[in-house]
Amino acid sequence: MESMVRETLEFMRGLSHREPAQLVDIMALLESLQADNEAMGRAVAIDGRVTRPWTGAPQLLKRCLSNLVDNAVLYGQRAQIRVEEAPDQLTLRVRDHGPGIPDSEIEKVFAPFYRLEGSRSRETGGTGLGLAIARNIAQAHGGDVHLRNHEEGGLEAILALPWKLA
């Protein structure tokens, strides 16, 4: 219950308490996220490298990625993070190996408090705010989060961010 109240308040507060933008070592942030998850016995793999810093709010980005990784581990047992560096944007793909979701539900799951009927259980927990928070953080940085069912199975969350805030 405490977690649900905390997440609801965070969502309602939005990004009004934004931390200042700074240069962020993406690989260090991802490795920290990986270590945090491994300490909890959760499998998170990182594939790819970023050679330049990203400009943004590191704690907000970590929260965004944590929400995506939490979903991947919760519904697909493990998370694979693929890092892609392009001249105009940084792309982080978080893939799970679970059942995916119906295409008709892909945009709906970004709505606050929306949960797929099959995901409502005591084991999975959650408030239905994780993806809404992740998308809000991405959009506050000029980017976005999209979902797609991966052709080899599972769900892939694609976080695309410009290198610098506008």
Q: Model features per residue range: what roles?
A:
Residues 101-115:
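Short conserved segment of the HATPase_c
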